[in-house]
């Protein structure tokens, strides 16, 4: 702003993470703006700031294009109240233990055949949908346990699961999000083993 140079915003959705949020966060956003998509909040946040020339958005489907056009044509800037609301929402999101993977796949291929992005994507999806078991004593434990284990085996073949990680760290150097990948894989593997043994 000081130098009068305009900005171009890349990855306004953090690789899709801001469009795929936990259920209680999505409900909160929908309650405030029933007509707005989840993604539109991030687009409007990026576009509201002065000095933004362009917001770049990767689109896979026609509905993404339609939603982007609706968000920016015309852009409805966020109010001060909206910005406070989003700041509070961001704080709530930080309390959820998702892994900040954007599925860029720079960590691939793993020399041991581990499907790192899919493992993280599956874990984040379960967190967002409330299918992470906290304790064997919780009411939802059996449902969450079954949901995680069954969907994990469907999403990731056995020979590509987190249990295969030896902690070589080759993947870590390539991650633009600076995720400590071996540690996260070991955390997921421990969680899976605890579910299998009912020792949470």
Annotate each predicted stretch with a short phrase.
Residues 1-200:
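Structured C-terminal cap/extension of enzyme domains
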């Amino acid at each position: 702003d000081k130098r009068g140079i305009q900005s171009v915003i890349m990855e306004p959705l953090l690789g899709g993470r801001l469009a795929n949020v936990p259920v209680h966060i999505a409900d909160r956003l929908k309650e405030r703006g029933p007509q707005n998509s989840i993604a539109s909040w991030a687009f409007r946040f990026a576009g509201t700031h002065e000095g933004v020339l362009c917001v770049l958005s990767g689109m896979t489907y026609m509905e993404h294009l339609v939603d982007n056009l609706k968000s920016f044509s015309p852009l409805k800037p966020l109010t001060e109240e909206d910005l406070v609301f989003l700041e509070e929402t961001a704080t709530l999101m930080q309390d959820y233990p998702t892994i900040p993977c954007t599925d860029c796949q720079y960590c691939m291929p793993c020399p041991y055949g581990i499907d790192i992005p899919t493992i993280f994507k599956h874990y984040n999806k379960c967190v967002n949908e409330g299918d992470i078991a906290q304790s064997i004593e919780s009411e939802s434990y059996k449902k969450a346990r079954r949901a995680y284990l069954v969907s994990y085996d469907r999403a990731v073949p056995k020979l590509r699961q987190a249990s295969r990680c030896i902690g070589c760290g080759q993947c870590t150097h390539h991650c633009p999000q600076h995720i400590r990948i071996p540690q996260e894989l070991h955390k997921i593997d421990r969680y899976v083993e605890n579910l299998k043994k009912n020792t949470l």
